[in-house]
Amino acid sequence: MKQLLEFIPLILFFTVYKLSGIRDAAITLVIATIVQMLILRVKYGKIEKQQVIMGVAVVFFGLLTAYFNEVKYLQWKVTIVYALFAAILLIGQFVFKTPLIRKLLGKEIELPDTAWQKLNLGWAGFFVLCMLVNIYISQYYSEDIWVDFKSFGIIGMTLLATLITGVYIYRYLPKDKD
């Protein structure tokens, strides 16, 4: 249920964009994101920091996009959020000597410190890649192509990164000796 709830604003954004354009899609995205945050707060008692960052960014840049009827603000949001996530992971690892990805997954999974560090760097690299691909597509392709990329391309990239992470973690899981 929680994962499905996270996709609803994006699905609504894509649908309204195709029917009515960027201004209405941005307004729909802002409203759906606020409703999503309220549901998460009521149903689960809290909202994760990552979701708060995304929610604030969606509302801020979505309102700018709606007000100016200009997609570039939502395009900036994607770039800025991914840059922020990469910076947080890199600062955690190199300044505070803590791979922050461990805080997300470390309760369920035990890995050696070097594995956490590589995983942390991998996700930081993934966020930088998403940021760069977003910049490229937003600058060199049409608004329609960018909306398709934002709606489906980033999801595909994230699923692939998650699959690679799972394969990487699997190498460190205890092996049964039957």
From Swiss-Prot:
What family classification does the UniProt entry report for this protein? Belongs to the YciB family.
Native organism: Actinobacillus succinogenes (strain ATCC 55618 / DSM 22257 / CCUG 43843 / 130Z)
HAMAP family xrefs = YciB
Q: Which domain of life is it from?
A: Bacteria
Subcellular location, in the record's words?
Cell inner membrane
Query: What parts of the sequence cross the membrane?
Result: 19-39, 51-71, 76-96, 121-141, 149-169
Tell me the InterPro entries matching this sequence: YciB
Asked if the record carries the keyword Ribosomal protein, the reply is: no
- This chain's protein is named Inner membrane-spanning protein YciB
Q: What is the protein's membrane topology class?
A: Multi-pass membrane protein
Keyword terms of this UniProt record = Cell inner membrane, Cell membrane, Membrane, Transmembrane, Transmembrane helix
Q: What is a single cellular component term in the Gene Ontology annotation? A: plasma membrane
Q: What does this protein do?
A: Plays a role in cell envelope biogenesis, maintenance of cell envelope integrity and membrane homeostasis.
* Gene expressing this chain: yciB
